[in-house]
Amino acid sequence: MKVGDEGAGDGGDEPQLVEELRVQEPSSPPVVAYRAARRFFTDPRTVGVAQAGPRTAAFMARTWARSREPVADPHAVPARPSLGLAVQVLLDELLISTMKNPRLLPRRADYERAGVEVAQAFELYRERGWLEDPESYHRTPGAPAVWSTRGERALGQPYEHLSFQSDYEPHRGEPGRERWLEMDANRTAHAWVLRQADPGRPWVVCVHGFGTGAPFLDLRAFRARRLHSELGLNVAVPVLPLHGPRQQAGVASGEGFMSIDLVDTVHALAQSAWDVRSLIAWARLIGRDAPVGIWGLSLGGYVASLVAAMEDGLACAIAGIPATDILDLYHRHSPPAVRKRALEHGALGPEATAVQNVVSPLVLRPKLSRERRFVFAGLGDRMSTSGQAHRLWEHWERPSVAWYPGGHVGFWWVGSVNRFVTEALVSCGLSAGPSGASPAPSLSSSET
């Protein structure tokens, strides 16, 4: 029996119960209780939690079967079934379930608007040559002319809260332009900064994932204290559009960044790249052209990969557990009925894919050399998926990579990931390694 199926039950008595409830007052306790229970058991989040265990079991069964097959691709790193992998996969599945808010499911008008705007964007991008040359869609920002900083603390960690005006605007004539510019809070860029006494020390720009944008989460996710105190780096963590203080009051962090409205996602990613590049220009300005590397996690891995295809002179680019294809994620994580209607209205399909390509790190070519590109990902990632990371790794000409036997959110507890990132920063000249320690050991078994 599926959770929430109407008419399902051991005795088949629910239709009679429903009929009895209909004749009662709408506000009577039995009716209220029944409706509340029905909402709970049909809520996609409840259904998702109930299905997390079976989904994990199915994944582990597939993993076991694949582990017994001959490995045809010498570059493939098959996952090995283990209790630790199962726990991390289950954690991913549970987290995915909590993100399936029924309030965010598209309505008929949303499908229609999204389909019309995709068609308009496709025609505009084709006419202006952006489909043939996606790089020409993007403009180059400068350092902010005016900025402000104030000292703050998060979980005992002092940092500077940097803010400046984001000068990004969608191109004139782009669908969704006016809607995007109406989001006032989003027009101020923010970043959490840990500066060395010498601003000329190298910088690492760390781009957070979807739904965060709070200093206590972002600084912890990147182990910013270690980057700053042990590796001797200046650290800047930009807040992505529609996240944290850039979101409208009363709206969850990240809401609207990835939705049925693909043109909003295009604007969000284009602005992400613009603002991160403005932050890099600022770091170079105050750091007297100090070297700058970029490291992103999840959605931040997507943005870091995008910036690596636009920004000259980066010391390194590290894509961690990266998302690389938004439409593929939409296909994967949306209910079948939503996917079907989106395809029917043109919100998904060939034109949508062409529109997405102007902000795709799988289409744009990275500007930095292969030895300065790095990828790490979990073989059991149920959110961004290891497949998306593998596509980026291939597009980046198979640079140094670390595959770990875990899920999306479990990277933080994997020691080999921490060593891999340290080695990347050391090998590119951003750091001499942890204070008083020799450089991190090579992960040659993970390199190709």
Residues covered by each model-derived region:
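The feature captures the conserved acid-bearing segment of alpha/beta-hydrolase catalytic domains
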Residues: 329-388, 394
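Hydrolase active-site cap/lid region
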Residues: 305-351, 403
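Cap/lid segment of the alpha/beta-hydrolase catalytic domain
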Residues: 208-270
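Short beta-strand element of the alpha/beta-hydrolase
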Residues: 201-209
